Swiss-Prot record:
UniProt xrefs under Pfam families: Ribosomal_S14
Biological-process GO terms, alphabetical: translation
Taxon lineage: Bacteria, Bacillati, Cyanobacteriota, Cyanophyceae, Synechococcales
Role of this protein: Binds 16S rRNA, required for the assembly of 30S particles and may also be responsible for determining the conformation of the 16S rRNA at the A site.
Keyword Signal: no
GO molecular function: rRNA binding; structural constituent of ribosome
Coiled-coil annotated residue ranges, if any: none
Keyword match Zinc: no
Entry similarity comment: Belongs to the universal ribosomal protein uS14 family.
Protein name: Small ribosomal subunit protein uS14
SUBUNIT field: Part of the 30S ribosomal subunit. Contacts proteins S3 and S10.
């Protein structure tokens, strides 16, 4: 189980990303469309002025059951240990033990 403070920090970052997503995407579109170097520099400064935690790259994929940050499968949102346990119990629809 991950520390509760780290889970809370990631939840806070997720909210921040959602709150600034529209503004950040509008600025990025303007930045990519601008051809004048001075205009691009001005837009870049505006992007840098946004909160650091509003960037989507600062979010971390975590297991929703345990909060572990590593070994998380995107399709399920579970870490490898939880995925294995729940698959053996039959709690994951469509997941079967392989045999060949």
């Amino acid at each position: 189980m991950a520390k509760k403070s780290m889970i809370a920090r990631d939840a806070k970052r997720k909210k921040m990303v959602e709150r600034f997503a529209a503004k950040r995407s509008a600025l990025m579109a303007a930045f990519n469309a601008a051809e004048d170097p001075m205009e691009r520099l001005e837009i870049h400064r505006k992007i840098q002025g946004l909160p650091r935690n509003s960037a989507p790259t600062r979010m971390r994929n975590r297991c929703w059951a345990t909060g572990k940050p590593r070994g998380v499968y995107r399709d399920f949102g579970l870490c490898r240990n939880q995925l294995r346990e729940r698959a053996h119990k039959g709690e994951l629809p469509g997941v079967v033990k392989s045999s060949w």
